[in-house]
Structures are given as structure tokens and as C-alpha cells.
Amino acid sequence: LQKRVWITWETQRRSIELSRKFGCEFFIIEHKGVMRYPISVFETLSILKKTKPDILFVQNPSMILAALACICKYILKYILLVDRHTTFLLDKDYKNIPWVLFFQFLSRLTIRHADITIVTNSLLADMVKRLKGNPFILPDIIPTFVETERVELKGRRNILMVSSFGIDEPVQEVLIAMKDFSQDEVCLYVTGNYNKLDERVRSTAPSNVVFTGFLDEQDYINMLFSCDAIMVLTTASACMLCGCYEAVSARKPLITSDKDVLREYFTDAVFVDNTAPGISASIKKILDNIDNYRERIESLKGKLITQWEEQYKQLEKRLSDVNS
């Protein structure tokens, strides 16, 4: 049996789930502060020396981890798969910004020297091909959640907005859209650390918006099951949103941004242009047809689970071909 190892420098559900599926020995190396990189490099080298993998999976980010794995591959002679989560600034032309140019250099290096670069969508796969890499599309596994209790929510209809208050999230437009609804009619619950949101923007939220703050895992899962629909938005063009997979898992009608990569995968969602009028209209649309959208998402869940298993089998075959 071949020895499989998965190393990541940050905790993400995707790496945990995929490492389990691929039968890998799993290592999380997480450090903060100025010594983060030298300590992480040392621990990674120690793991590689101890485990002597035949097949190594690494998560990118971290770019440094992926680059290190590419270098060590030629010494330790393992097959390398890099699970790449973002474009890492390769989709834009940045000039005269030294740290960006350095990261772009590492990005190209890791794409060309990895045996397989795993990506979540066709847009990223095309980018990897253009840079002479070997891509394979494998979205996230639809997670399995267990509800432990129903959360009492205050609206007649309740929407959960899955948020991290990132710069790619049109939170202000959502707050404006919610002014079209009364508190009795529709209530919006927004997850995530709201301290990241500008206080001036937060103060404009109407009374039918509740900021939950960061929720622990089980409380978050219970919220997924307790709401009527889930909203997950981004302005980014190549981002597959974790909250979309979670909405499908909980069989909840989904409102998400009108991006090609999201349309391609989450076919039965309601897609929105990230404007306040568009968001308001999408909420009305989904709540006026809630049973229909619930059935469509339930059907989509079964389809995506079957589709993912087929993609997984194809990747195992690709891995076998590389190995031979």
C-alpha cells in the first residue's frame, strides 16, 4: 500500500474531509507571529522525513507550503497534489509590487511542478492549463451535518446570511435590501465577526437584521437548519463559496451571486447581481416559492453527491496513471 500524507498550514473543513476520503495521514501545522514560517517549514520537513510519503497532498494556501513541497518532491520522489483554493493574484496584472510579483512567481512554480493541481471550478482549471499545469476539478464534498436543536428565530420567514465580512461581500447592499421588508415579514441573521464591518455601515442596519457574531460549529449548524433560506454572496469571479455547499447540505433554498462558477455548480439556486434591488427581488422570489425551491435544492443535493463521487473516482484513476 502506498503511503499517503496530507499537510496543511491552516484549518479548513475541505482539507479535513478530503484527507479522510483519500485515506491520508493528516497533519495540521498552525503557528502565528513572526516565526510562523520558519517553524512551519521545519515541522513540515520533519513530517516528510518521518512519514516518507509516496503521495503527498498539500493545501494552497499556504503558497510557501506548496513551493516547499515542490522542491522536496525532487529529493524525496513522491507524487505531489496541490489543492489550490484561489487564483492567488494570477488573474490580474500587478506591476511594480514586489511581494505580489514574488507570490506570482511562486504560484507559477507550484502549478508547473505539482503532478496534479486540484481546483474547485473550470475557471481555475483553465488558468492552471494556461500556465502549463495539470488541473483536476474537484469541488468540496457536500458536508454531513446533524441538527441538535431548533433555534427560535423572530421573523415569520428567516434568512441566514453566511458571512465573514470579507471585502468581496456586498454587505451594505444587503442591509439596504432588507429595508424593503418589515420585521414581522422577514428577518435576516448575519453570521461572522461583525467587528470587521465598518461601524458606519453596521449602524444603517434596519431592525429586521440580527448580527449573530461568530458561532461555534454546532450553533452554526443549528442555524442552518432553523432558517427558511440561506444567502451567500461574493463579488469574486472564481470563488466557490463554502456556505453554498452548507445550504445544499441542510436542504435550504439558496440565494447566491450571479457568477459563472456558481451557476455551473449550484444550478437550482436563485442568482442575484449583488445590487440592493436585485437582492430584495431575489428574497421575494424565493420566499414566494419556498416549497418549490426547497424541493429543487433537495434534488440538487442528491445529484451533487453522485457527481462528486464520480469526480473522486476519476481523480483516483488520474493518480494511478501518474503513478504508473
How does the language model describe each region?
Residues 149-169, 175-179, 189:
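Conserved donor-binding/catalytic core segment of Leloir-type glycosyltransferases
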Residues 108-148:
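Donor nucleotide-sugar binding/catalytic pocket of nucleotide-sugar-dependent glycosyltransferases
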Residues 269-277, 284-291:
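Conserved acidic donor-binding segment of nucleotide-sugar-dependent glycosyltransferases
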Residues 198-218:
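Nucleotide-activated donor-binding/catalytic signature segment of Leloir-type glycosyltransferases, i.e.
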Residues 229, 252-256:
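Short hydrophobic beta-strand element within catalytic cores of glycosyltransferases
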Residues 225-239:
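Acidic donor-binding loop of glycosyltransferase active sites
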Residues 42-45, 71-75, 88, 98-117, ...:
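Membrane-proximal helix-turn-helix segments that form the acceptor-binding/catalytic region
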Residues 291-323:
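A charged, aromatic-enriched C-terminal amphipathic alpha-helix characteristic of glycosyltransferases
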